[in-house]
C-alpha cells in the first residue's frame, strides 16, 4: 500500500543585493546519495518538529547560516518507490546574509552563490527548478507583496 507523508523540507537560500539576488547551490558529497548532484538545502522533518522549524535547522546544519526572513512557498510531491511513499516536500525561501561564512555539513562538498537564472540551470531536479521559479515569482520584489501576511513565517 502506498502512503503519503509530509516529511521533507526544501529551502532556497536567497542573498538579496541591489545589484541582483544570488541563490545558494550545494553540491552533494561523493559519499552520499546522488553524489555530485547540485541541489538546494533539503532534509527531513524530525518527529515533533514543524516544517518551518525543520527548515531553519536544516539551513543551519547544511550551511551554518542563520535565516533572517523565512517564507513558505509551495508543497511539492515526489515518489519514493523504495518506501512506497508519496513524499510531500514543504518548500521555503530563506533570506540570509550572503557575506556570512558558510560551513558545509557532511552531505555537501561544494557551494556556489549564483544568479537565479544560473541556479535554475544548476539544479538537477526539475521540481527544484520549478520551486525556484515560484520563489522568484512570489518574492521577486523583495517581499511577498499583497500576500506577505500569508507567506511570511518570520
What are these regions (language model features)?
Residues 4-6, 18, 33, 84-87, ...:
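A generic fold-level signal
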Residues 14-16, 29, 95:
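A generic structural motif
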Residues 91, 102-135:
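NUDIX/MutT-family hydrolases
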Residues 127-154:
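Charged phosphate-binding loop/patch that engages nucleotide di/tri-phosphates or the phosphate backbone
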Amino acid at each position: 500500500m502506498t502512503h503519503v507523508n509530509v516529511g521533507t523540507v526544501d529551502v532556497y537560500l536567497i542573498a538579496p543585493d541591489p545589484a541582483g539576488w544570488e541563490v545558494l547551490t550545494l553540491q552533494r558529497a561523493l559519499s552520499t546519495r546522488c553524489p555530485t548532484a547540485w541541489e538546494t538545502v533539503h532534509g527531513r522533518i524530525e518527529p515533533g518538529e514543524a516544517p518551518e522549524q525543520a527548515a531553519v535547522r536544516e539551513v543551519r546544519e547544511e550551511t551554518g547560516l542563520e535565516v533572517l526572513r523565512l517564507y513558505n512557498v509551495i508543497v511539492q510531491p515526489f515518489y519514493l518507490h523504495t518506501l512506497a511513499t508519496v513524499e510531500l516536500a514543504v518548500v521555503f525561501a530563506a533570506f540570509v546574509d550572503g557575506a556570512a561564512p558558510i560551513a558545509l555539513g557532511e552531505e555537501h562538498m561544494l557551494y556556489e552563490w549564483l544568479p537565479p537564472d544560473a541556479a535554475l540551470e544548476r539544479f538537477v531536479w526539475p521540481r527544484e527548478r520549478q520551486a525556484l521559479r515560484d520563489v522568484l515569482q512570489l518574492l521577486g520584489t523583495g517581499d511577498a507583496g499583497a500576500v506577505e501576511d500569508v507567506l511570511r513565517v518570520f
